[in-house]
């Protein structure tokens, strides 16, 4: 199924081969790398992947010491799927769970589930647009553990749905140990997700997170006790959840809502409103909550609500 980096599959055009070889030769380190590549064609419309290759070329020009690292992680791969399977397998492997075993598992899931890589691209774009600390797609791809944890969860969730629960839970455990992010493989997570900093994020089994949601570090989407069944929060599209917030129980956070940092939320939050405090209260009051026009997940504004909270004291 797999071929070495220098071997082209039957059906590749000469243009495909020459285009990739040009990129490969530029980045080739001073030693041979025996890697297996599953995808052998760079798609012309894959703007994110092409941009990553361009960024990698620029980075290596600035820092030649990174040539081998970038070659192994980015430029020796002919697809985003292969590069993602590689970086996750390296990050999540240990002495008894070698990276080549994880690579084969991850690449098989990614090849069979193209929707995962589409979500990966949207996540990369989300991080680049919303996090001022992110200087490039490659920077996010190689070093942002929130992004990597989210992609590992997407693979684990696919395995969970296939009733391969033991290996899905194993991935959850390795992500928790490696990234300090604990997302149950049963949780449903949309695309365009930003897990900023990500340390201490916990998402329970029956939680649902919509599209274009931004979640800061130390956030818990948890249950309220030991009851089973549908017991975790449902987060709408475009929501911003501030650092250190706890959202508990089978409640709904409406589309475009904002949860202030450090809040404890145990009741539904209407769409386009702001909840803050412990226990959380709606800005403007329960009867007439103030609604905002901007999309919180994009503005990443975590403090404007403080001036509208009448009893805020410093």
Curated annotation (Swiss-Prot):
Tissues expressed in: Mostly expressed in leaves. Localized in cortex, trichomes and vascular tissues, particularly in phloem.
Q: Which UniProt keywords apply?
A: Acyltransferase, Amino-acid biosynthesis, Chloroplast, Cytoplasm, Plastid, Transferase
Catalytic activity of the protein? L-serine + acetyl-CoA = O-acetyl-L-serine + CoA
Cell compartment(s), UniProt = Plastid, Chloroplast; Cytoplasm
TM region positions: none
Which superkingdom is the protein from?
Answer: Eukaryota
GO cellular component labels: chloroplast; cytosol; nucleus
Q: Which GO molecular function annotations are given, in alphabetical order?
A: serine O-acetyltransferase activity
Q: What is its EC number?
A: 2.3.1.30
Q: Does the keyword Transferase apply?
A: yes
Q: Does the keyword Hydrolase apply?
A: no
Q: In which pathway does it act?
A: Amino-acid biosynthesis; L-cysteine biosynthesis; L-cysteine from L-serine: step 1/2
Please give a single GO biological process term from the UniProt record: cellular response to sulfate starvation
**Which InterPro entries does this entry report, sorted A to Z?**
Hexapep, Hexapep_transf_CS, LbH_SAT, Ser_AcTrfase_N, Ser_AcTrfase_N_sf, Ser_O-AcTrfase, Serine_acetyltransferase, Trimer_LpxA-like_sf
Primary localization: plastid
Q: What induces it?
A: By cadmium (Cd). Not induced under sulfur-deficient conditions. Repressed in trichomes in response to NaCl treatment.
What enzyme category does the UniProt record give?
A: transferase
The record's family statement is: Belongs to the transferase hexapeptide repeat family.
Q: How does it assemble?
A: Homomultimer. Interacts with OASA1 and CYP20-3. Component of the cysteine synthase complex (CSC) composed of two OAS-TL dimers and one SAT hexamer.
What's the stated role of this polypeptide? Serine acetyltransferase which catalyzes the formation of O-acetyl-L-serine from acetyl-CoA and L-serine. Also displays O-acetylserine (thio1)-lyase activity in vitro. May be involved in detoxification process by mediating the production of glutathione.
What this protein is called in its record is Serine acetyltransferase 1, chloroplastic
Species of origin: Arabidopsis thaliana
Gene that this sequence comes from: SAT1
